[in-house]
């Protein structure tokens, strides 16, 4: 090998690409160079209730010494959990067996990558565990691999976009059972048999966050369709919601056009629909953070008209919702020329794909505040780095400490009393499970659980909004 280093930070390595008699170079941080031309090929995966055994094969190289096998936490602040492993050496290869016992690991939500730590040229390198065929991807589609990982939690393996092995750790879900896989296979079979008929229906599926809400742009779009379109025009427009959700009461009058979330009909229509219309991304149309799923992979390929759930102006959403982001849209509704310019310039959509439509939920927004009820709405937005963390980690966050301190402030309670005002603390839906951790001081502060009262009704009657960088400010301003 030939090595060049630039100020000790970048390694330049020439190599022959696939034996095609050409020379290429790659510039990477030194600790990632070995991973460019060395593969830890996954040969086999064995599973039991709480353990996963991974068998890997790696070509031996002069000067390369394996030091460790770890699970690496995927986060801005990464840390490693050592994994038990064995190594056998043949003439040309290392045979590495990694033993992962998830019950014994102190895991955090969400993503963990399997890495081999090796030393070469005095530099510690990390080598990813890679799949070399689609066999395991297909295996994950058909099987129900998951591992117990402590009380109320589980982890499962998945195939990353780069073809590597990773694990997702989260709370248990009612959709983790093998019955979900059976439902997926049944729906797939029905779809294949009746695809021409189902496609002719031109089905539209409308939904909101987690398919558990009916109070955002998706709901008002659906309501408009039900009340203003002809029977022929609306006959194949459906709203997907969990009928156990409180908001179901608002739309049950349209029950012929309501589909129960995660029912066989839902899974079948997810495959059959020609368009999704939603205030949230495609991931909200299916079981949240589901295991490797053939249905979930099909959802990503269906057209979607994104109604948005907040004006795009305060947050950089390009990496997520941009045309080349992780969750791109087919059509992207905007509320003004100003917002359309942002979506076109920074998210890379054409004007035709980002029409100025306004928000359907704004059709019902009006000021219903009264002098007799001086209501203040306190609604901060969520924090991506705190999504689905444990209660213990959430309680340590600055977010919790600051808002908890405010809600228990005697000075705030005194101010509210002096002005005969009251305050509602409405936590973001993604933090709904953490509301139980907050306490308040006085009777003039109310902690409203997600779904108990429609947010737009609270906004309509509030005198003042206090927020950070939540797009809810645009609704109140409107």
Model-derived segments and spans:
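Active-site and donor-binding regions of nucleotide-sugar-utilizing enzymes
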Residues: 54-55, 73, 82-84, 93-97, ...
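Short, polar loop motifs at secondary-structure junctions
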Residues: 241-247, 428-432, 470-471
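Basic, ligand-binding patches in group-transfer machinery
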Residues: 1-203, 227
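Conserved catalytic-core segment of nucleotide-activated headgroup transferases in glycan assembly
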Residues: 214-229, 360-437
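Acidic, amphipathic alpha-helical patches
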Residues: 266, 412, 454-455
């Amino acid at each position: 090998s030939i090595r060049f280093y630039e100020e000790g930070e970048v390694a330049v390595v020439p190599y022959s690409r696939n034996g095609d008699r050409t020379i290429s170079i790659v510039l990477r941080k030194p600790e990632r160079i070995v991973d460019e031309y060395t593969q830890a090929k996954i040969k086999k995966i064995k599973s039991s209730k709480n353990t996963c055994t991974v068998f890997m094969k790696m070509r031996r190289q002069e000067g390369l010494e394996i030091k460790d096998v770890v699970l690496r936490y995927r986060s801005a602040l990464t840390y490693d959990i050592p994994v038990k492993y064995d190594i056998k050496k043949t003439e040309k290869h290392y045979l590495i067996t990694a033993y992962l016992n998830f019950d014994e690991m102190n895991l955090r939500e969400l993503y963990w990558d399997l890495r081999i730590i090796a030393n070469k040229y005095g530099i510690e390198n990390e080598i990813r565990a890679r799949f070399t065929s689609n066999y395991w991807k297909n295996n994950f589609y058909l099987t129900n691999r998951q591992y117990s990982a402590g009380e109320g939690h589980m982890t499962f393996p998945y195939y990353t976009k780069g073809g590597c092995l990773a694990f997702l750790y989260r709370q248990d879900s009612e959709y983790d059972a093998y019955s979900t896989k059976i439902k997926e296979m049944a729906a797939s079979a029905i779809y294949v048999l009746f695809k021409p008929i189902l496609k002719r229906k031109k089905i539209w599926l409308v939904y909101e966050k987690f398919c558990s809400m009916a109070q955002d742009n998706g709901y008002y779009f659906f309501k408009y369709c039900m009340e203003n379109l002809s029977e022929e025009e609306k006959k194949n427009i459906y709203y997907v919601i969990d009928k156990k959700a409180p908001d179901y009461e608002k739309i049950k009058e349209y029950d012929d056009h309501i589909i129960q979330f995660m029912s066989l009909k839902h899974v079948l229509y997810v495959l059959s629909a020609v368009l999704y219309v939603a205030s949230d991304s495609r991931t909200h149309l299916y079981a949240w953070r589901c295991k490797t799923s053939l249905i979930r992979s099909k959802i990503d390929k269906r057209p979607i008209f994104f109604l948005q759930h907040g004006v795009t102006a305060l947050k950089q959403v390009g990496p997520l919702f941009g045309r080349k982001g992780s969750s791109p849209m087919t059509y992207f509704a905007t509320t003004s020329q100003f917002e359309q310019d942002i979506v076109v310039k920074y998210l890379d959509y054409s004007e035709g794909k980002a029409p100025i439509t306004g928000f359907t939920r704004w059709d019902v927004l009006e000021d219903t505040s009264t002098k007799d009820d001086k209501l203040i709405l306190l609604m901060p937005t969520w924090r991506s780095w705190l999504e689905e963390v444990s209660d213990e980690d959430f309680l340590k966050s600055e977010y919790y400490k600051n808002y908890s301190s405010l809600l228990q402030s005697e000075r705030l309670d005194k101010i509210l009393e002096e002005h005969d005002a009251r305050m509602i603390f409405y936590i973001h839906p993604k933090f709904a499970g953490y509301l139980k951790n907050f306490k308040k001081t006085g009777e003039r502060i109310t902690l409203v659980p997600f779904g108990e009262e429609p947010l737009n009704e609270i906004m309509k009657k509030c005198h003042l909004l206090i927020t950070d960088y939540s797009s809810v400010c645009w609704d109140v301003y409107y």
